Structures are given as C-alpha cells and as structure tokens.
Amino acid sequence: MTITKAKIAAMLSSKLGFSNHLCEEIVHTVFSNILEIAKAQKLTLKNFGSFEVKQKNPRPGINFHTKALVIIESKKHLRFVPSSKLKALINESTR
C-alpha cells in the first residue's frame, strides 16, 4: 500500500479537526525534519524502527557484456531495521 503525505494530512485533518492546509504543513515539516536527521545520523522512531545511512565499500564486479572486471564505486544506502514491537504487530496481523 502506498500512502502520500497529502493522504496522511487528510487523515490527520479528519481525525483532529484541523484544517487540511495546516495538517499538510505539519506533515511536510515532520518529514523534512526526519530526513535532515536521517542524513546526519541514525534515526530511531520508538516502536517503529531505525533508519541509518550506511556506506558500501568499493568492490569488484563483472561487466556481463564484455566479461571485463570493473570496480563498483562506493555509495551510500539506507538501512531500515524494524523494532521488535513492529515485528510482533505484523506477525500478529498475519495469523
């Protein structure tokens, strides 16, 4: 299921009774702050999970067309580790 920030804002608006515009600003601000924190360090959302930017080291690879050995450059990737409570919730809902 894909959910947009606008949909989250609409859900907040209907649940809390605030204007849709205010809820959109709140959601945008929250996500912007989460992104800024996640870029700099590990971000843990209690009872949800942890986001961390990890660095992959350069490694050898093979070009499948030419069979030549190439070096794959280092790059950053995002790692998410769900909390034990989130895992338990997911496992309960599948039973």
From Swiss-Prot:
Q: Does the keyword Nuclease apply?
A: no
Q: Name one GO molecular function term.
A: structural constituent of chromatin
State the InterPro entries in the record.
Hist_DNA-bd, IHF-like_DNA-bd_dom_sf
Among the Pfam families in the record, one is: Bac_DNA_binding
Q: Which GO terms describe its cellular component?
A: cytosol
Q: Which UniProt keywords apply?
A: DNA-binding
Domain of life, per UniProt, equals: Bacteria
The family classification in the record reads: Belongs to the bacterial histone-like protein family.
Identification of the protein by name? Histone-like DNA-binding protein
